Amino acid sequence: TSRGLGDVYKRQAPVFSKLFPDIPRDHPVTGSIFMNLSANLLGLDNAATPMGLKAMQQLQELNPNKESASNSMVMFLCINASGLTLIPITIMMYRAQLGAANPSDVFLPIMLATFTSTLVAILAVCVRQKINILQRNLILFFGGLGLFIGGLVWLFNSMEQEQVSLYSTLFANTLLFTIICGFIISGMRKKINVYDAFIEGAKEGFQTAITIIPYLVAILVGIGVFRASGAMDFIIQGVRFGIASIGLNTDFVEALPTMLMKPLSGSGARGMMLDAMNTYGADSFVGRLSSIVQGSCDTTFYVVALYYGSVGIRNTRYTVQCALLADLAGAIAAIAMAYLFF
């Protein structure tokens, strides 16, 4: 599969070279970055992490200041933290388990929301790093994606709700099946033992996990204090009062726990999402919105602690600011998509 993804990467190399100008041409880290982002696109979080950690180690080798994040690290982390996901397999699985009539009805809203958060993350980092976003390759790539997403919004917005559910499900299932078959066929053509390759990667991932445990303990303790202090409940009630006071719809406020927890803890946000679906129903507005939020961005502080901690980076520069801006954009887009589709 790595060689197959490498073939796809070669087609996107002009875009990568613009976003990561400090990485030498044909350096192995480009393949690791692309494989990590590809795994995230497929919703394979556990598979993406070892690839991402390997990419960080390779980026650290290129980094002249071993304690401060390089420009390439910041760009990579912000894209990662934006949670770019094409097929939210886990979320659809939870929705099915909790009795959703159509577990994949959130597929398209999630894709639109996560595209928004990723685009904001890239633009924010480009501005900070003074990367010219008007370069031809970037305009063609992101302009094409924007037109594709905009076209989908227009198409599905003109359909009845039953048609939206039918065609979004068909699109997701067809795409997933095609990708899986593509990996298998690519492996057979190149005589790669995919299972053995997976086992070797798992061994490396286990060794890395031992290295990062202290950093994870620190971030999880901080999350626990925030939850136990009641600060989250205070924020939610304040937002509800503010929204109601200006006469706006407050239905989305019940999904705020998932939005607030998402940048801090993936398991915490997942628990908030499941709690919302159990309380209000998997097919309720709140249940669907919580699912969209869960898929629209990633756990920023967890990703930063995990990835930077694995290579000993202490100065993260503006990574957190840009990633949180992307999280905010993803949350706003998730709310907009929920009102649009449901």
For the regions a protein language model found, what residue spans apply to each?
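Hydrophobic alpha-helical transmembrane segments of multi-pass integral membrane proteins
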Residues: 16-52, 217-235, 240-276
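C-terminal transmembrane helix pair
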Residues: 48, 55-96, 100-130, 256-342
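Membrane-interfacial loop-to-helix junctions in multi-pass transporters
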Residues: 18-31, 62-70, 168-175, 206-214, ...
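Juxtamembrane loop-helix boundary motifs flanking transmembrane segments in multi-pass membrane proteins
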Residues: 11, 29-30, 47, 51, ...
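Signature of multi-pass transmembrane helix bundles
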Residues: 93-227, 244-246, 318-342
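Single conserved hydrophobic/aromatic residue that forms the stacking wall/gate
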Residues: 1-5, 9
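Juxtamembrane/interfacial segments around transmembrane helices
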Residues: 35-44, 84-87, 124-134, 159-167, ...
